[in-house]
Structure formats: structure tokens, C-alpha cells
Amino acid sequence: MTDKAKTPMIEAIGLSKYYGDFAAIENVSFKLHQGEIAAFLGPNGAGKSTTMKVLTGYLSPSAGVAKIAGHDMNTDRLAGATRLGYLPENGPLYPDMTPRDLLNFFADARGLEGKHKRERIEEVVHLCDLGHVIGKAIGKLSRGYRQRVGMAQVLLHEPDVLIMDEPTAGLDPNQIREVRNTIRKLGENKTILLSTHILQEVQAMASRVLFINEGKLAFDGPTAEFARQGASLDERFYELTGQTH
């Protein structure tokens, strides 16, 4: 067994984040290994984005430990960040830049050089199907293309772990299908955690569900078990939250 297979690629150990007396998340724990695609499911405001920001080192936990590929993201963030690609829901894309400009900028920031830099840019442009918009201003692209530009940017340094916050939010059905296909392809050899409150996304992309409600992990298991005893995903959502979806 390889080191990647042995070591959890994403690990939350008793994560809590407090703002005064309010617990945005409380005692959240789970592990994801190489090749897993997990959907972080829950209603708006449940704690999905907060957990992701703590996992990626953008927020420090009030308690607990977040690890990426074995690296503590509070004390060893740089080492963990080299293994991580993080796509926030509304990441900065610099609307006056073209996708080519943006990818060159981030490739330089990641220390990619020469032939390797050119090859990586070419590979992510192909993977994310950006070839015919590569020279257009990002601000003039559709939301679907902007999302693909963001995905290409986080893939440049060949991360082992991808964390994506609402990757299909605001996309039309065709764009959603394309993003889903890309994520499934990437999940063959990477570890992916994606947040959503859209139940169809769970069945379409993820083999595992992490369901969070009011800052606490309410379910962690296979997608098939989430819809247990013949219940639909909508029924399980209501059962766990008391809310319709």
C-alpha cells in the first residue's frame, strides 16, 4: 500500500470554530482517502463553508486539528498547501485578465517554469475545455466558463486534494453536466471534497455523504446508506434537518 493510500488526504479531528458564544462548527471529525469523492451536504448556514475554510487553513480552528495529506494546516500550512487545490464559491478571477494571463500568473506564483509550465497550462486548458476562450477577458465569460477557469487555476500545480465550495452554483444544466464530468474524471486519482445543498449533485458525483446541520456532523457514510430504507434524498434531508428542500 502506498503512503498516499495509508495517510488520510483530508482529516478533520474535533474541529470547532466559535464566534463568541456561537458555534459555527462544533467537534467535526472525518477522514477522506485517495480516490474518494465526498459531498459535504447541508442547508445554507449549516457550517459547510466554515469547515472548508478551516480545512484549507484560511481560518484557524478554535479547537481541533485540520490536516491535508498529513500536514497540520494550522502549524504546517505551506506544506499542506502544496498538496491542495481550493476553489471557493466566489474566488478572485481578475475580470480584466484573460484565462491565459491568469494561468500564467498563477503558474509563476506556484514556481512553475519553462517547458513544465507550458505543458501544465496546456493540460489544464484541455481538461477544462478553455481553448476557444483562452484569449477573452474573464469578465466577459459566462459563469460556467469562469468556474472552469477557476478549476483550471487550482489544478495547475497537480494537487492531490481538491476542496470545492458549491462548484456548480449558478450554472445552467449543460454547464453543470460538464463540471460534473470533469470532477468525476479528477476523482479517479485525487481526493475531492465538494460542498453542495443540491441533492442531485450528491448522487451524480459522490460516493460518500458528509451531512452537516447546525454546525455538527449528522451523517457520514456511503451515498446509498444516506437514502436508507428506500427513502429519497429529499426525505432524508427533511429527516435530518426538519426542513423541506
How does the language model describe each region?
Residues D220-G221:
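ABC ATPase "signature
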